[in-house]
Amino acid sequence: KKAKLGMAIKVLENAKMRNTGICGATETVLFHKSIAKKFINPLLNNLQKKGCNIYGDSDVKKIFKGKISLANKRSWHTEYLSSNISAKVVRDVYMAVKHINQYGTMHTDAIITSDKKTAKFFLKNIKSSIGIHNSSTQFADGGEFGFGAEVGISTNNLPPRGPVGLDQLVSYKYEVYGNGQIRK
């Protein structure tokens, strides 16, 4: 609920539209109810101008003045990998985390907020392998993490099949902190 509008517009545009076909592309945007009326139209209009189709819950549909389709339960599970995005209004960060953990891909999720306590709660409680604060989800890439070219992606908490020793039982969760960075 404590987000900078300019940063949110810039980061969401990059997170969704820079490259829509990668697993780090944003597929759902959640708006805190206290800022929904201020943020929904600028953010979603900007995406729509870039060619993005919007699927929103009934709250978003009431507020958004652009073209919108009503989201359904399947919308929240969909990894579009295209110029489509789902949008929903949530009561608080707890509801946001619950929604993400129920419907998300468990790959990468981000929060835009100036409230460090809220960001810390979000990053700690999402089940995603990468949690991002105030930066684009498009940074979710092996090369950006210094791992070199990716050979695969795992969102599982358990190690791969085969012999398992102590080293194979380690699972990582990455937290990325930013101040409005986008990926070029």
Show which residues each predicted segment covers.
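Conserved C-terminal structural/oligomerization subdomain of aldehyde/semialdehyde dehydrogenase
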Residues: 72-184
